């Protein structure tokens, strides 16, 4: 599996730093990944759905730690590039909604 595209949508929130959309092998898209600033630094949160009991369940996620680490490295590298291009995380502008296509 290869991550063939990473699209980063920075946001101005305390812990949430960006929404991310990735494409795998030019043929499968995963939306709504998040870059989160936690107690130990940045990490990637997988897309999740709130359950009736209020807990969250991942909709899609890697099945092993090697794949998760590869995804995290790739996504965070692109997040860093995006910040360097535009400076600090900008407020979301029209046309930059990760849910548009």
UniProtKB/Swiss-Prot annotation:
Check the record and name the InterPro entries matching this protein. SpoVG, SpoVG_sf
The region called Disordered is annotated at 82-101
**Source domain of life:** Bacteria
Task: Please report a single Pfam family linked to this protein.
Answer: SpoVG
Q: Which SUPFAM superfamilies match?
A: SpoVG-like (SSF160537)
Supply the alphabetized keyword list: Cell cycle, Cell division, Septation
Keyword Zinc recorded: no
Q: Does the keyword Oxidoreductase apply?
A: no
What biological-process GO terms show up in the record? division septum assembly; sporulation resulting in formation of a cellular spore
Family, according to the entry, reads as follows:
Belongs to the SpoVG family.
Q: What does this protein do?
A: Could be involved in septation.
**PANTHER family of this UniProt entry?**
SEPTATION PROTEIN SPOVG-RELATED
Which HAMAP family does the record cross-reference, listed alphabetically? SpoVG
The name this protein carries in UniProt is: Putative septation protein SpoVG
> Gene that codes for this?
spoVG
């Amino acid at each position: 599996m290869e991550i063939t595209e990473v699209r980063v949508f920075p946001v101005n929130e305390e812990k949430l730093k960006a929404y991310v959309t990735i494409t795998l092998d030019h043929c499968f898209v995963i939306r709504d990944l998040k870059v989160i600033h936690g107690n130990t630094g940045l990490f990637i949160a997988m897309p999740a759905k709130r359950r009736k009991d209020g807990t969250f369940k991942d909709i899609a996620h890697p099945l092993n730690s090697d794949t998760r680490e590869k995804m995290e490295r790739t996504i965070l590298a692109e997040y860093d590039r995006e910040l360097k291009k535009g400076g600090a995380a900008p407020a979301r502008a029209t046309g930059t909604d990760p849910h548009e296509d």
